[in-house]
């Protein structure tokens, strides 16, 4: 047993590396990573709900350990509420809020932070166990440890974002920091998902080089889809951050026009791309539509091509998720039902993951 553990941690023996590369070990590690990906996707939903509730500023301290325990007594609740009363959001937006109202915004943010801790536990504990038992191939060990560290960095970015909302004159977090927080979370989710695919389908099982060359065009279309979806997601973070979904709730026109008359209301002009509600909504509409057209074109081309079965399935899933995504976006806008918008944000990550899957299935073996 001791020799097995040493081989697992150091990976210096052929037997240890063979165990890590076995189908059983790969399956176990892949399942763990897919579960982690699912938990991260759920975190997007919780975060979106927190934002819709304007609850993100309700907890005034970042306490990774002691913050696990919420207020348990009336006096503790009053102390927490008193801290909230010191920030501009309470003074300008929520003055007169009672303790029950404060609890209503406290709990979503507390759950959001607890879910982050759960993610750290879910990723960190199995990682240690897999390393100790030699279930992870040597080439993946530094990368998986890096992913765990990046998860902690995401927590720091989250607090950096929240802290921006405590500044004088501000009643919500910085739109720019919100975008960084969301985009970093998306990158982390996709990195975990792609790593799971790598574990499940190692290099030696990929397409032969000559076959991969034949599908180079489809692979480029998958990469193009990744780029288009990513750009639309980034634009969506500024729509969400400015609450631009609260205006111009018609489709496809805005205020009876294709381009809203107040698109360039802010000066200098560049601010409109990030801080002008009309502009951020128009940009997301436009970029989302461009992404939809581009992705659908890729899916149609993939269906017509003689792709391997799994690659074809990936493109079909991407197409289905794209249609759902567009319907969710338009429905959120015209109905003003924010819960649909939460699903829209969740589905965006799944759509991007499907595009990554399609690209991954067309990769060739190393020469």
Curated annotation (Swiss-Prot):
Its EC number is 1.17.99.9. The chain crosses the membrane at residues 28-48, 114-134, 143-163, 180-200, 221-241, 286-306, 314-334, 340-360. Its cofactor is heme b. InterPro entries: COX15/CtaA_fam, HemeA_Synthase_type2. It is found in: Cell membrane. It is a multi-pass membrane protein. The keyword Transmembrane helix applies. Its main location: membrane. One of its GO terms (biological process) is heme A biosynthetic process. It is an enzyme of class 1 (oxidoreductase). One of its GO terms (cellular component) is plasma membrane. GO terms for molecular function: metal ion binding; oxidoreductase activity, acting on NAD(P)H, heme protein as acceptor. Pathway: Porphyrin-containing compound metabolism; heme A biosynthesis; heme A from heme O: step 1/1. It holds the Pfam family COX15-CtaA. It catalyses: Fe(II)-heme o + 2 A + H2O = Fe(II)-heme a + 2 AH2. Heme binds at residues 284, 344. The keyword Transmembrane applies. Keywords: Cell membrane, Heme biosynthesis, Iron, Membrane, Metal-binding, Oxidoreductase, Transmembrane, Transmembrane helix. Belongs to the COX15/CtaA family. Type 2 subfamily. Interacts with CtaB. Catalyzes the conversion of heme O to heme A by two successive hydroxylations of the methyl group at C8. The first hydroxylation forms heme I, the second hydroxylation results in an unstable dihydroxymethyl group, which spontaneously dehydrates, resulting in the formyl group of heme A. This is Heme A synthase 2.
